[in-house]
Amino acid sequence: MQANIFVFAFLLLSVAVAAYGYQPECLEPSLYGCRGDEDATFGWTFDREDGGCRQGSYCTRFGQPKNYFRSERDCKKACGNA
């Protein structure tokens, strides 16, 4: 009986995670820009501390980070409008 309860709870949790749409890029560190006069690319990032999307930039020479979105709409679509 107890095993059935654990199986049911696991299945319920799995369905909830799948339905919510887990987005790992939203859990990555936010964009915080570059030092000095380095080339920067500007866009949008999800800020976990504030729980919302904000403008940010990254240093082009390091490559595009995972928590970068071209528009506020893309950011909100992936990470939610918290």
UniProtKB/Swiss-Prot annotation:
InterPro entries: Kunitz_BPTI_sf. Keywords: Cell adhesion impairing toxin, Cytoplasmic vesicle, Disulfide bond, Hemostasis impairing toxin, Platelet aggregation inhibiting toxin, Secreted, Signal, Toxin. GO terms for cellular component: extracellular region; transport vesicle. The keyword Transcription does not apply. One of its GO terms (molecular function) is toxin activity. Disulfide bonds join C26-C79, C34-C59, C53-C75. Its main location: cytoplasm. Expressed in salivary glands. A motif (Cell attachment site) lies at residues 35-37. Residues 1-21 form the signal peptide. The keyword Transmembrane does not apply. It is found in: Cytoplasmic vesicle, Secretory vesicle; Secreted. Tick salivary platelet aggregation inhibitor that plays an important part in the anti-hemostatic strategy of ticks. Inhibits platelet aggregation induced by ADP (IC(50)=130 nM), collagen, the thrombin receptor-activating peptide, and epinephrine, although platelets are activated and their shape changed. Binding to platelets is similar for resting and activated platelets (Kd=50-70 nM). Acts by specifically binding to platelet membrane glycoprotein IIb-IIIa (ITGA2B/ITGB3) in a divalent metal ion dependent manner. This is Savignygrin (+). It comes from Ornithodoros kalahariensis (Tick).
